[in-house]
Regions:
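A short local loop/turn or secondary-structure capping micro-motif enriched for an aromatic residue
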Residues: 165-169
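Extracellular/periplasmic head regions of type IV pilus-like filament subunits
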Residues: 53-146, 150-153, 160, 170-176
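Aliphatic-rich helix starts adjacent to a transmembrane/signal segment
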Residues: 31-48
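Alpha-helical segments that scaffold the active site and NAD(P)H-binding pocket
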Residues: 25, 52-53
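N-terminal single-pass transmembrane signal-anchor helix
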Residues: 4-32
Length: 176
């Protein structure tokens, strides 16, 4: 019998390496998913802050102290400008951004301030006395866990169930 000089790894050594990689992956993947959800939630909060800012600017410059009732109206540029009040990635109600659906509407107690034809950006709906915006995860537990809402006051609220926050913020808590 002739002995050969073997070079390389044995099957056992390779299996041990694969098992170690599997254990590391099992530990790391849930943390990465939680980090992704936290990032999506931070993006949703940022979107609501951008909406608050856009609504404030719309009200003071274009809506005769009234607020827009849709993202479409916020995305329209005022007379003499080429840019709307909100970034193009938030240009329509129901837009999906970072795993969250974002919407703007009039608040439940909103009254008409000025007709749509009287706004300076050709809004499709009348400017109203108060607005409501919400962002909820498309897939609760996967793209995000909490839902968020805000209104004319500018305070952001959250709900841990992931269901869309209702106008009036019933059942929601103030985000610290």
């Amino acid at each position: 019998m002739k002995m050969r000089d073997s070079k390389g790894f044995t099957l056992i050594e390779l299996l041990i390496v694969v098992a170690i990689i599997g254990i590391i992956a099992a530990i790391a993947v849930p943390g990465l998913l939680r980090a992704r959800m936290a990032g999506n939630e931070a993006s949703a909060i940022g979107s609501l802050r951008a909406i608050n800012s856009a609504e404030s600017t719309f009200s003071s410059s274009c809506g005769a102290n009234g607020y827009a009732v849709s993202l479409e109206d916020l995305s329209k540029a005022p007379t003499g400008s080429t840019q709307g009040f909100i970034s193009p990635d938030l240009a329509t109600n129901g837009v999906i951004k970072s795993g969250y659906e974002v919407n703007v509407s009039s608040d439940t107690s909103a009254a008409t301030i000025t007709a749509a034809s009287k706004t300076y950006n050709g809004a499709s709906a009348a400017a109203v006395s108060s607005y409501f915006a919400e962002a909820h995860p498309v897939n609760v537990g996967s793209t995000g866990q909490r839902s968020f809402g805000t209104d004319t006051r500018g305070t952001i609220y959250f709900d841990n169930t992931g269901t869309a926050v209702a106008a009036g913020m019933s059942g929601a808590s103030v985000l610290q």
